[in-house]
Amino acid sequence: MTAGTLEDLGGRWRLRFTREIAHPQEKVWRAITEPEHMRAWFPQDVSGQWVVGGPLVFSGPEGRGPDFDGEVLAYQPQSLVEFRWGTDVIRLELAGRPDGCTLTLLDTFDEVGKAARDAAGWHECLDRLTDDLDKGELSFQPGQRWAEVHPRYVAAFGLEASALGPPPGA
């Protein structure tokens, strides 16, 4: 298990996940930025263009939460995309390695009480991403990984960071 960490930014909070992925950076870039590939792992459908300042719309497939507006905050092809997703700021960074690439996901938010819930969600999302890249299908049921790892994040982050329960669909 590659667990995420929680950082106190003095009024804001950040979840950090780093995954070593044994696929070429270009392939992973497509998986994290192209809507038809994002459906395999991201919690909502995404529409819009990856242009700094451009609007994004996030819609909830399969009952996975409410719709959100967003905005592209930073974009560097093949290496970085950052966007506002509701009130959160999501940053995805890719760095090439000889045997694949390193993906870093950062989620910056205001309410510490959702940290364990969202960490378990991102953990499942990243497992879905690697399953899709490796096999083209999931090796677990949606929500299953969330249920497995959520207690670990509650224990790691504490009760203050565990005020909210599972998201829709978990």
Region spans (language model):
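Short amphipathic beta-strand and strand-loop transition segments with alternating hydrophobic
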Residues: M1-D8, L94
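Beta-strand/loop substructures that line and gate deep hydrophobic ligand-binding cavities in soluble
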Residues: L73, L80-L133
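Short, conserved charged micro-motifs
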Residues: E26-R30, K114
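Short beta-edge strand/loop motif at the mouth of beta-sheet-based domains
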Residues: G10, R16-F17, H23, K27, ...
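Active-site oxyanion-binding pockets that recognize sulfate/phosphate
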Residues: G11, T18, V112-A115
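A conserved amphipathic terminal alpha-helix motif
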Residues: F109-A170
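Conserved catalytic core of Hanks-type protein kinase domains
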Residues: A31-I32, Y75
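Charge-dense, helix-prone N-terminal extensions
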Residues: L56-F58, G65-D67, P98-G100, P166-A170
